[in-house]
Amino acid sequence: DEKQLRIYYMPKALYIDPNETLRPKDHELKLPVIPVMKYNKTVKEELKEGNFTKEDLLRIYRDMSYIREFETMLNQVKTTGGYNGVAYNNPGPAHLSAGQEAAAVGMAYCLDTDDFIFGSHRSHGEILAKGLRSIQILPEDELKKVMEEFWGGATLNVAKKAYDGDDTKELGIRFLLYGAMAEIFARTTGFNKGLGGSMHTFFTPFGIYPNNAIVGGSGSIAVGAALYKKVNRKKGIVVANLGDGAMARGPVLEGMTFASMDQFNTLWE
């Protein structure tokens, strides 16, 4: 493929013709109506319309349950010093997102391993959701290779100790849950050897890129990752998971501005 290098120079003087710039037709911006809170279907309706299979919906519910229990575990460890009778002290941060499981799992359901996610300081749920989705769609031989080659199998070996079955997908789930938990608890068997912690965990084989302690920080980083994909003609999209408060932060507005400057032709559909 031909690659072109374009060099732009800042002009010393730029004449602006009022007759061209201030044309009446340019004085009006028209935006389409954006529907809000329009979804209102039951599980039975979704099944009847063929949008999901029963297995799809059960898996979605299972993933939501995993995330809720994971966050419940972290909260109990933080507030009571233990979980299910096992004493443990976690002096590190634990920014939870209990109640937002559907948003994380719904996002991940639409993605594959070529898609990237970036998050916030409350991204445990998104990490688990994307990981569970990747485990579901990856061929077993590829999943096994990912687990065996990651840190020389250090994380996998711990997960194996608590599982004597031969289901690769089930082992993958245990690998994911343990790797994320060990990272939050600053263990060397965590996904980032305990150096990322709760707010900077990532696992790139599943398309999970670092979440960010800076509120809204992923808003501009994700745009850069998307531009990388476009320039290099890589598959997939990039998702920045942010809270409503982060939408007013500088990095998010910068990301939107950058994305609208003709680097991308479509922001959303």
Regions found by a protein language model. Give the residues of each.
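Conserved acidic/glycine
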Residues: 1-103, 143-145, 155-156, 163-164
